[in-house]
């Protein structure tokens, strides 16, 4: 039944989220999308308007507000709280046309079988909505396809369906969806929807593009030369694998390209079987043209290609096509992929049963999708370009090589690539692996010498494919090469697939946990050590043969071995590739999972060391190459340097007096003499120019989120971020911006933004800036060794109140932050309230003398001198047990007027304000008097420990440090 009729005739609109809406008036379910249902003035379905510009301009904010208020009233039970009268909440419902439901992410209850899963985000969409959704949510997927599919190489007919505009569609059979699930929603149509990312558009590579479309002779050779992975036989990709039973029939449509990502539903496949209706297609984005290639059934390679993927007669275990379009791997790997391969083969087997068969197939697709979803995690080929190049190279070699490709063609059968792209691929591809034909294949091709490391190296290189050890750089094999001739037919295909050394990893692009990663690195290193000696010996022999070193080297930057080289690969390069583990592997390591910190540590180590350990980038090859290479090696050195970057040596740019002196010196120099050295003078203390660039660009200013690109594409995994941040903090200079040392609340978000200084708050009654409750504690970092814990301890500990820790904050004996403020400013005189336990007899005069002496000291000694003096005599004075230590000694200044006069006092006041502005701990600063008297028992001595040093401090009375000392605490 058409999708529109799914609407319950009783007039209830589709319940969304399980809430039933009342319907005002009864819409009759519209039987064709064209008919005028009350859904808007003209009753156009949104679908028919597709692609038109929206004329009307909404004030989005207004709309959103309305929505919000509506939602609130609805959630509160629908009553308007303002008007308490009996306003019944009337819900007016506008019926959606079924064609439009997809746009709102709804799916009619009965239509659940018509849903397409978006593999990037696992959302459910009807097909119309799916196109819309892809265009909006995953545009990257969209572009990834359309730019790569090769539109219409030889002017072959563009499939008529792809161009249908919405109006034509509606003439063809109502709107697109109403024309009965049998055709629109048939399994075959869905095949283009199968993965949200790329469906199975087989790439046409430039080498083959010209020849492939119509002529049978050239296409057979095309199957040989192209690598089976990317485009070999589009039969394995195009209409997905068809079982051997239906081979003759489906052959004509086998090499059809799906174009565009899922949304364009192009079905030229079932025209003959369907007869009555062409399946309708959504108008695809105009860029993409579907290429329908009808290959004559006589092509030699086609049958082989089919049997390759459905080798057993049982169609249900044929491998799904492996789409090769590159989209971001993260987007593809997540969701459930629904691949219609099975359904299609079922349907094609029994033409006469087809309508029924298809209905059944589409209704039960969820079960099948479950089966398929694991097999079909689409393999993302992130090295597409490499493949294109190698294929081009292949083509060239077939022209220039001593032997042309035709000689190989007859006896070669393509090896199936097991699809290892899933986590537990072994269990899933078991049926395929156990398939007898495949086993025979393997047994025939397996060569034990591959496992024997003592074998000649050249032998191993030839057997790239079966080597346990993946990362050898590919080389093109020559047919005349006596040693390797026998293996050639078997391994040629693999040699192409291995173009990028890590091809095999790339098929298992799933996340690697730390242990595996370590193992992998370890294995690779082992392999290297075993094989290095052999490689070196061979290298010496082959070096004599090599004249065109430079050309080969130049090519190998792009990893295309040059046309004329002997069958040999530069060992240097092999080692490099040995160690490069695909960025995409690293990309996928779970990024915000607190449990995985251990993995992160391993990873961080790997990032810094593994890549660089065994690779000697700077080995001198020979004089000739050196010139060409200089630029390349420089780049390598630079990369190395950045990786081993020593943060401890970082100097942040500062404008202190020191720098000013430097500036003067630089200015006095005649500017022209040494342009190298004459950078901006303030950078003079940076180690290298690169370093200074790092300082200025990355590390100065408010620390913005930082990601260092280790390989050029890698987001930092957590562990690294944390260490970077730690290093930055310790190297930051005092004059740089604030940093909160509160550390990883956010599990190592890199460069978490420090709190900016608190915004000016409303002034207190006395005209001073008040506390800002929001602002946190900040610390001005000096040098890494100075930000030692004692500083932190000092700032973190609460300032404890009088005898009992402070009564109500209002009571005169308790020093609140505000009160301290007033005292410092001289706004309020301090009340001398001798507390009960004091013996204040001779205490006060001593106190004053003490202060005077300190004033003298302040004038005579330099800061460091005083510090030395304070630290010299360590007099361990235990505090009375009950007394918590008072860690912020303040100068008890009885003549307030004097305190106002000298500036250090002002400065101290500012510093204190900064510290005290933290409202989280309610600090009570006890009355100075109190404090000095509590400690009267201890003999005052100028040498006693400065109070901020540890627990041996004696609060207050003895050496009340002057303001300059206090500043040390805060600066």
UniProtKB/Swiss-Prot annotation:
Effect of inactivating the gene: RNAi-mediated knockdown results in lesions throughout neural and retinal tissues due to tissue degradation. RNAi-mediated knockdown in the retina and the lamina results in degeneration of these tissues and a rough eye phenotype.
InterPro entries: Ser/Thr-Kinase-Related (IPR053109)
GO BP terms, alphabetized: SAGA complex assembly
Gene Ontology cellular component list: nucleus; polytene chromosome; SAGA complex; SAGA-type complex
Protein location: Nucleus; Chromosome
Assigned keywords, A-Z: Chromosome, Nucleus, Transcription, Transcription regulation
Function per UniProt: Component of the transcription regulatory complex SAGA, a multiprotein complex that activates transcription by remodeling chromatin and mediating histone acetylation and deubiquitination. Acts as a tether connecting the not/nonstop-containing deubiquitinase (DUB) module to the rest of the SAGA complex; regulates DUB module specificity. Important for regulating deubiquitination of histone 2B by SAGA. The SAGA complex predominantly acetylates histone H3. Important regulator of transcription during embryogenesis; required for nuclear anchoring and cellularization.
Subunit structure: Component of the Spt-Ada-Gcn5 acetyltransferase (SAGA) complex consisting of wda/Taf5L, Saf6, Taf9, Taf10b, Taf12, Ada1, Spt3, Spt7, Spt20, Sf3b3, Sf3b5, Nipped-A/Tra1, a histone acetyltransferase (HAT) module made up of Gcn5, Ada2b (Isoform B), Ada3 and Sgf29, and a deubiquitinase (DUB) module made up of not/nonstop, Sgf11 and e(y)2 tethered to SAGA by Atxn7. Untethered DUB module (DUBm) composed of not/nonstop, Sgf11 and e(y)2 remains enzymatically active.
Remaining remarks: Shares sequence similarity with the 3 sequence blocks that define the Ataxin-7 signature in other species, however the order of the 2nd and 3rd blocks is reversed in drosophila.
UniProt record similarity statement: Belongs to the ataxin-7 family.
Protein name as it appears in the record: Ataxin-7
Species this chain originates from: Drosophila melanogaster (Fruit fly)
């Amino acid at each position: 039944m058409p999708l529109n009729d799914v609407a319950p005739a009783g007039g209830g609109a589709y319940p969304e989220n399980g809430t039933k809406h009342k319907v005002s008036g009864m819409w009759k379910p519209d039987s064709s999308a064209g008919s005028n249902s009350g859904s808007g003035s003209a009753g156009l379905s949104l679908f028919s308007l597709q692609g038109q510009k929206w004329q009307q301009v909404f004030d989005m904010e207004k709309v959103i507000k309305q929505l919000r208020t509506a939602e609130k009233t609805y959630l509160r039970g629908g009553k308007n709280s303002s008007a308490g009268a009996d306003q019944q909440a009337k819900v007016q419902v506008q019926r959606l046309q079924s064609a439009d439901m997809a746009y709102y992410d709804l799916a009619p209850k009965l239509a659940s079988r018509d849903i397409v899963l978006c593999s990037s985000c696992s959302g459910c969409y009807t097909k119309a909505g799916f196109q819309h959704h892809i265009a909006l949510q995953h545009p990257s997927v969209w572009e990834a396809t359309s730019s790569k599919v090769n539109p219409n190489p030889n002017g072959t007919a563009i499939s008529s369906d792809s161009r249908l505009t919405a109006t034509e569609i509606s003439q063809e059979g109502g709107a697109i969806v109403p024309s009965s699930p049998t055709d629109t929603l048939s399994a075959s149509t869905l095949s283009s929807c199968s993965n949200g990312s790329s469906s199975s558009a087989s790439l046409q590579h430039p080498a083959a593009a010209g020849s492939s479309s119509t002529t049978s002779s050239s296409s057979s050779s095309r199957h040989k030369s192209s690598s089976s992975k990317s485009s070999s036989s589009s039969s394995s990709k195009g209409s997905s694998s068809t079982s051997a039973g239906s081979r003759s029939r489906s052959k004509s449509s086998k090499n059809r390209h799906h174009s565009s990502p899922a949304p364009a539903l192009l079905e030229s496949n079932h025209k003959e079987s369907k007869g009555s209706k062409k399946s309708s297609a959504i108008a695809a984005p105009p860029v993409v043209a579907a290429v329908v290639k009808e290959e004559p059934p006589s092509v030699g390679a086609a049958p082989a290609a089919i049997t390759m993927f459905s080798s057993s007669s049982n169609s249900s275990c044929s491998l799904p096509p492996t789409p090769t379009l590159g989209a971001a791997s993260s987007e593809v790997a997540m969701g459930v992929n629904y691949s219609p391969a099975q359904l299609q083969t079922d349907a094609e087997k029994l033409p006469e049963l087809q309508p029924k068969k298809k209905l059944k197939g589409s209704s039960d697709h969820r079960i099948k999708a479950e089966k398929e979803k694991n097999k079909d995690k689409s393999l993302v080929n992130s090295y597409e370009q490499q493949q294109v190049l190698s294929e081009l190279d292949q083509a060239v070699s077939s022209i220039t090589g001593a032997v042309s490709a035709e000689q190989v063609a007859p006896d070669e059968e393509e090896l199936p690539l097991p699809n290892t792209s899933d986590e537990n691929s072994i269990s899933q591809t078991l049926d395929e692996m156990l398939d007898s034909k495949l086993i025979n294949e393997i047994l025939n091709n397996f060569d034990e010498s591959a496992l024997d490391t003592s074998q000649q190296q050249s032998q191993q290189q030839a057997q790239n494919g079966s080597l346990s050890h993946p990362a050898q750089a590919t080389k093109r094999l020559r047919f005349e090469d006596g040693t390797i001739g026998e293996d050639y037919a078997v391994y040629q295909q693999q040699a192409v697939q291995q173009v990028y050394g890590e091809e095999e990893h790339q098929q298992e692009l799933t996340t690697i946990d730390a242990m595996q990663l370590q193992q992998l690195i370890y294995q690779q290193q082992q392999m290297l050590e075993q094989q290095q000696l052999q490689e070196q010996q061979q290298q010496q022999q082959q070096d004599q043969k090599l004249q065109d070193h430079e050309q080969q080297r130049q090519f190998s930057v792009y990893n295309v071995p040059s046309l004329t080289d002997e069958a040999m690969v530069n060992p240097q390069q092999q080692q490099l590739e040995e160690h490069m583990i695909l960025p995409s592997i690293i990309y996928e390591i779970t990024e915000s999972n607190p449990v995985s910190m251990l993995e992160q540590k391993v990873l961080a180590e790997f990032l810094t060391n593994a890549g660089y350990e065994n690779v000697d980038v700077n080995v001198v090859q020979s004089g000739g190459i050196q010139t060409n290479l200089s630029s390349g090696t420089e780049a390598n050195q630079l990369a190395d340097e950045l990786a081993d970057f020593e943060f401890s040596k970082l100097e942040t740019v500062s404008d202190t007096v020191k720098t000013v002196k430097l500036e003067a010196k630089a200015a006095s120099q005649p500017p022209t003499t040494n342009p190298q050295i004459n950078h901006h003078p303030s950078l003079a203390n940076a180690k290298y120019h690169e370093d200074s660039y790092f300082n200025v660009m990355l590390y100065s200013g408010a620390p913005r989120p930082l990601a260092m690109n280790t390989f050029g594409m890698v987001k930092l995994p957590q562990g690294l971020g944390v260490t970077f941040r730690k290093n930055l903090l310790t190297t930051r200079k005092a004059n740089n911006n604030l940093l909160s040392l509160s550390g990883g609340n956010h599990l190592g978000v890199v460069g978490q933004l420090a709190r900016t200084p608190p915004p000016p708050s409303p002034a207190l009654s006395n005209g001073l800036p008040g506390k800002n409750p929001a602002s946190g504690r900040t610390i001005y970092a000096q040098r890494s060794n100075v930000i030692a814990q004692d500083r932190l301890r000092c700032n973190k500990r609460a300032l404890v109140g009088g005898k009992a820790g402070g009564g109500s904050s209002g009571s005169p004996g308790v020093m609140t932050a505000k009160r301290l403020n007033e005292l410092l400013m001289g706004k309020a005189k301090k009340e001398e309230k001798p507390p009960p336990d004091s013996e204040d007899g001779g205490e006060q005069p001593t106190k004053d003398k003490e202060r005077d002496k300190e004033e003298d000291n302040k004038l005579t000694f330099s800061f460091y001198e005083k510090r030395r003096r304070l630290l010299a005599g360590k007099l361990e004075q235990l505090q009375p047990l009950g007394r918590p230590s008072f860690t912020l000694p303040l100068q008890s200044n009885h003549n307030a007027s004097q305190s106002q006069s000298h500036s250090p006092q002002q400065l101290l006041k500012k510093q204190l304000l900064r510290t005290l502005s933290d409202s989280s701990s309610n600090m009570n600063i006890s009355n100075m008097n109190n404090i000095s008297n509590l400690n009267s028992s201890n003999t005052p001595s100028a040498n006693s420990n400065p109070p901020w040093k540890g627990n041996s401090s004696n609060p207050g009375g003895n050496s009340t440090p002057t303001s300059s000392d206090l500043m040390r605490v805060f600066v």
